[in-house]
Amino acid sequence: MKFKTNKLSLNLVLASSLLAASIPAFAVTGDTDQPIHIESDQQSLDMQGNVVTFTGNVIVTQGTIKINADKVVVTRPGGEQGKEVIDGYGKPATFYQMQDNGKPVEGHASQMHYELAKDFVVLTGNAYLQQVDSNIKGDKITYLVKEQKMQAFSDKGKRVTTVLVPSQLQDKNNKGQTPAQKKGN
């Protein structure tokens, strides 16, 4: 039973790492191969409903990935593997991951939602993503993982805010070029 719980929890960690990919960078290559550690004040399992609930100071770690939440619920509709839905709740729920380029990605929201079958991630309620000094914030951020498409929304009367640091954009654009090639641009 512990293996099933850890397998379901792997999807939560995968969700956070996929979400982190929405800021242009690549996750630390071996993170998802690392063991998953989950700590919480309480844990409950509803075998008939296919639901695992972690409550109270939930901490999920895998490699450089770290998620903190007040509550994490993993549901497997119909008991089908690969159809898991993961919801994390907090004031806020947070995540952190180091990227291969050595730059961390951090984020938070009141709710983090991930649908494994659709590779669809949603941050809702004061949603925020940051890499170094570049960030995006809004009331809701959605990410289609396979298509690498992100959208940010805000409630009526509010606006989405994005801060891009030019040096970070240049680092990405000059990736793989020698110093001489960079000077020639």
UniProtKB/Swiss-Prot annotation:
Q: Which UniProt keywords apply?
A: Periplasm, Signal, Transport
Per UniProt, what does mutating I38E do?
Answer: No change in activity
What's an example GO BP annotation here? Answer: Gram-negative-bacterium-type cell outer membrane assembly
InterPro entries xrefs: LPS_export_LptA (IPR052037), LptA (IPR014340), OstA-like_N (IPR005653)
What would be an example GO MF term here?
A: glycolipid transfer activity
Q: Does Transport show up as a keyword for this record?
A: yes
Q: Where is this region: Disordered?
A: 166-185
Regulation: induction = Transcriptionally regulated by sigma-E factor.
Q: Which cysteines are joined by disulfide bonds?
A: none
Q: Which GO terms describe its cellular component?
A: cell outer membrane; outer membrane-bounded periplasmic space; periplasmic space; transporter complex
Summarize the record's disruption phenotype note: Results in an earlier growth arrest and onset of cell lethality.
The main place the protein resides is periplasm
* Phenotype for G138R: Cannot complement E.coli lptA-depleted mutants. Exhibits lower thermal stability. Has a lower propensity to oligomerize
Q: What happens upon changing I38D?
A: Decrease in activity
Q: Which Pfam families match?
A: LptD_N (PF03968)
Question: Which range is the signal sequence, renumbered to this chain?
Answer: 1-27
Where is the protein situated, by its record's location annotation? Periplasm
Against PANTHER family, the record matches this protein to: LIPOPOLYSACCHARIDE EXPORT SYSTEM PROTEIN LPTA
Q: What family is this protein classified in?
A: Belongs to the LptA family.
Supply the domain comment.
The N-terminal domain interacts with LptC, at the inner membrane, and the C-terminal domain interacts with LptD, at the outer membrane.
Query: Quaternary structure per UniProt?
Result: Component of the lipopolysaccharide transport and assembly complex. Can form head-to-tail homodimers and oligomers. Interacts with LptC, LptD and with the lipid A domain of LPS.
Q: What's its job?
A: Involved in the assembly of lipopolysaccharide (LPS). Required for the translocation of LPS from the inner membrane to the outer membrane. May form a bridge between the inner membrane and the outer membrane, via interactions with LptC and LptD, thereby facilitating LPS transfer across the periplasm.
Name listed for the protein in its UniProt record? Lipopolysaccharide export system protein LptA
Originating species: Escherichia coli (strain K12)
